Amino acid sequence: MTTTKPVKQIMHERKSVRKYNANTTISRETIMQLLEDATSSPSSSNMQPWRFIVIDDKEIQKNINIFSFNQEQIETASAIIAVIGDTEMYLNAEEIYSKNVELGYMPEEIASKLAQDSLAMYGAIPKEALLNIIHFDAGLISMQIMLLAKEMGYDTVPMGGFDKSKFAEYMELPSNEVPILLLAIGEAAGPAYGSSRLPIERLVRFNK
């Protein structure tokens, strides 16, 4: 279903879809490829704090809707992608930078220093600041997921309105993983509403 549309066209065609064809399935292979492509997203120090739980079991979708304010799309979408943030993402610094050396992206001495700096810096950051970084990075990759999904012919809607504590408890998340948002993905059952934007002149200033 992948298209060859220009990125700009995909951006403008993407809408938040809340009504899905409940009979449409998306293969796990397709979703894995989608998420792998999305991980090209930038992140702070390339620490890649995102984790994903793909929920494609209808019974589980129904269960999580109990603490997601009974949103129709939770149950009718082909899958729900839960975007999770890992507050211990910096513990992967050595693995990440060693891979950069292996791939020829940087010399070993620079990679070693960057890994040590990341471990020291992120290990000392207050939790609130760390959560801000993780939420920012999660927003970047979530946008990539939605655009890539649209390119593949699927629609999405991001949802921040759910009880994150109850979700974490239900999914038995470890203490270092925090739920950030839910992304519904599937085939639209009808056209989405359009949405206006404020004039760009009101949103932009130059130099001050």
What is each model feature region?
Residues M1-K208:
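Acidic, surface-exposed loops and disordered segments
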